[in-house]
Every structure is written in structure tokens, then in C-alpha cells.
Design a protein with these regions (language model features):
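Cytochrome P450
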Residues: 1-396
């Protein structure tokens, strides 16, 4: 029997792309791998192959049992795994809240929150943890307000999301889904009461979903709960990691912050380069081939599982020359950090707004920001769908 390697984790490599993924992309771009939950799959690491899988042609996220893995099927994961028209219909219910125009209208509020959190950081005095004071609370409060949850609940919502994104042989943490699902159910009742008293159906995302369920019958209550949780988790953890790891990237390239202060037009490209180069999602959604497909010459048969690595694809030298280098002037930069095709990240515009706001404000307010500990002593969270810095002590 051929040897099957374990999936390499960026958490074991100081948040950087594991060297094994670089090697596989160059030498064995479609290879067998054992995932953290024990399943084996084809690991796809080249840009064009990853883009092909993400396009959806010949692949599906909707896995039949037992291919879906331990405790990963059923109602909780239904909205994550949908494909085709059902997926587009559910996505359409909330897409208006995430358009570039709608998100741009949130700019003053995101700036206000960022300023307030940096005030708290400065009051704490150096050394202070940028994760605890800024990177964690900002996306949590923003997504809570967008969804229609009390901002004061952001800490416990973050803890639930941390549990539901853990991966391993036990599969999905069903108790976390149940607890969070009960919370969403209670909040949905509050939104229903608001609607009965003349509230606007588009007041927030959860109210929109309650209206679509009650008045239009466009989704089941289980789908309402599941979709709410998926949006919440997606808006919390990935942006938290991108903020903290993005600040670390800038501090690790000391010439770049001064460059960005001198030329603010480079801020947008710098955000895109951080998104390209920094691993944020450890494990992308696993898919299954629905027909025989060749990827980089390797035959993937119908029914076989495929695990893509967007992180490896975003370093592909065929698309990104000198891909390991951090280059804020890189153009073009067609990274896949937000996915591709029908499942392109719904919250991409929101994530970009938060990242641009945080980085620009830090650059102006804390020009002398630096790490308060050696970079090699920083701890990264493993065993989750998303990567994450546990803390980022900084001084100024």
C-alpha cells in the first residue's frame, strides 16, 4: 500500500505555508493525504487545479454518508454543503446585505469601532495583546451588528464559533451547534416579535431570514439556523486571523509600514497581498468528484474525495512570481483567498473594509508599533478549520 502523508498544518510552522505543501505543488500536485478527521483524499495544490475544483464543474460539496465524515452530515451542515440552485437561492436571501455598496455604508461605524478599540489598547499600555484588544473584538462586534445580535454577546458567540471550527476524528462539535442553534432560535423569536410590531424586514440579516421563513416560505427553520451560524462563524474567525497575522506580516517587514504611510494608495494592494500570502483557512471545504476528472495529469475518479489547498495555490510560481515574497506592489494578484465561483466568499467586501480600516488606522496612530516578544515565541492555534494567533503582544 502506498504511504499516505498527514495533512501538513501551518500552525506547526509559525503560521507560514508548510514546506511540504510547497514541495507537493512543485513535485506531486495531486497526491493522497490523510485529513485530521481520518479520511483520505486527493490533495490539490496548484492554482489552476484548485480553481478548477472551486468552479464546481465535476465536483460537489454535498457529500453522501459516509463520505461526509464523522458527525458532519445532517441539518447543521446542510447550508455549507449545498450546491447548484438550492445554494444560490439561499445565498440570494442575504446577498444584498453584503454588496460593496452596503458594506461601504458601514465604513464610519467600522472606523468608530477601530478607534475605540485602539483607545483601549493604548490605555492598557505596552506590552498589550493586539488579538484580545483589536483583532478578536472588531470582526465579532461588526458581524453581530450586521446579523442583528447584541454586540455585548460577541465574546460567547466567539467561543461557540471556536468550538464549531475545531477539526479532528470526532468530527463536528454537535453540542456547540446545538447551543448556538438554541441562541439563534431565541434571537429569531425576538426578530419575529419586532416584525409583528411593524419592524422592517431588512433591518438586519437575521430579521431578513425570519421574514423569508415566516412570510415567504423560502427556507426551513433548520436552514435559517444553519445559514445564520455559517455566516456568523465566517465573519468572525477568518477576519480575526487576517488582522492579527496581517499586522505581524507588516511588523516582520519593517520597510513596508513606512512605505504605506508615504503612499496610502498602496494600502489596498497590501491587503490583497496579505490575503494571498498569509494562510488563514487551514482546511478548505472537502469536495467529491461527480465524474472522472484529470488534474495535472492525475485521474480523479467519480466518488473520490478532493481536498484543495488555497494556501498552496496562492504561492504557485506559475501565477505569482517569487510567490513566497511579500510584495505590496504585486500586480496582478488574482489570489483565491475568498474562493472562486458560486461559493466565492459572501463577506469579501466586509473583510476588506475591516482590514483596510485597521491597518490604515494603526499605521497612522501607532507608527512605532513593534513586537513585544520574539516572533518565534508566538503561539498559533492548530486543530481548527481556521489558523489563528493566540496572542500578539505589541509595544510602541
Amino acid at each position: 500500500m502506498d504511504h499516505v502523508a498527514d495533512y501538513p498544518s501551518a500552525a506547526d510552522h509559525a503560521g507560514e505555508l508548510p514546506p511540504g505543501l510547497d514541495r507537493l505543488r512543485r513535485e506531486d500536485p495531486v497526491s493522497r493525504v490523510r485529513l485530521p478527521d481520518g479520511r483520505t483524499a486527493w490533495l490539490v495544490t496548484r492554482y489552476e487545479d484548485v480553481r478548477t475544483v472551486l468552479s464546481g464543474a465535476g465536483f460537489t460539496r454535498d457529500l453522501p454518508a459516509p463520505a461526509a465524515g464523522p458527525a458532519a452530515g445532517g441539518i447543521p451542515m446542510r447550508t455549507v454543503n449545498m450546491d447548484g440552485r438550492p445554494h444560490l437561492e439561499l445565498r440570494g436571501l442575504v446577498s444584498k446585505a453584503f454588496t460593496v455598496r452596503q458594506i461601504d455604508g458601514m465604513r464610519p461605524r467600522v472606523q468608530e469601532l477601530t478607534d475605540r478599540l485602539l483607545d483601549d489598547l493604548e490605555r492598557e499600555g505596552p506590552p498589550a495583546d493586539l488579538v484580545r484588544h483589536v483583532a478578536a473584538p472588531l470582526p465579532a462586534v461588526v458581524i453581530c451588528e450586521l446579523m442583528g445580535f447584541p454586540a455585548a454577546d460577541h465574546d460567547r458567540l466567539s467561543r461557540w464559533c471556536d468550538r464549531i471550527t475545531a477539526v479532528g476524528a470526532g468530527g463536528l462539535d454537535q453540542s456547540a451547534w446545538r447551543e448556538l442553534g438554541m441562541y439563534v432560535g431565541v434571537m429569531a423569536e425576538h426578530k419575529r416579535a419586532d416584525l409583528k410590531q411593524g419592524g422592517r424586514p431588512d433591518a438586519d440579516v437575521l430579521t431578513t431570514l425570519v421574514h423569508a421563513h415566516d412570510e415567504e416560505g423560502r427556507l426551513s427553520f433548520e436552514e435559517l439556523v444553519s445559514l445564520t451560524i455559517v455566516i456568523l462563524a465566517g465573519g468572525l474567525e477568518t477576519t480575526q486571523t487576517a488582522i492579527s497575522a496581517g499586522v505581524l506580516t507588516l511588523l516582520s517587514h519593517p520597510e513596508e509600514p513606512a512605505r504605506l504611510r508615504e503612499d496610502p494608495t498602496l494600502l489596498g494592494p497590501a491587503v490583497e497581498e496579505i490575503l494571498r500570502r498569509q494562510p488563514v483557512i487551514e482546511l478548505n471545504r472537502i469536495q467529491m468528484a461527480t465524474e472522472d476528472v484529470r488534474l495535472s495529469g492525475q485521474l480523479v475518479r467519480a466518488g473520490e474525495l478532493v481536498q484543495i489547498s488555497v494556501n498552496a495555490a496562492n504561492r504557485d510560481e506559475e501565477v505569482f512570481p517569487d510567490g513566497a515574497r511579500f510584495d505590496v506592489t504585486r500586480q496582478p494578484n488574482p489570489h483565491l483567498a475568498f474562493g472562486h465561483g458560486a461559493h466565492h466568499c459572501l463577506g469579501a467586501a466586509l473583510a476588506r473594509l475591516e482590514l483596510q480600516t485597521v491597518f490604515s488606522t494603526i499605521l497612522q496612530r501607532l507608527p512605532d508599533l513593534r513586537l513585544a516578544v520574539p516572533a518565534e515565541s508566538l503561539r498559533w492555534r492548530g486543530g481548527h478549520v481556521t489558523l489563528g494567533l493566540l496572542e500578539l503582544p505589541v509595544a510602541w
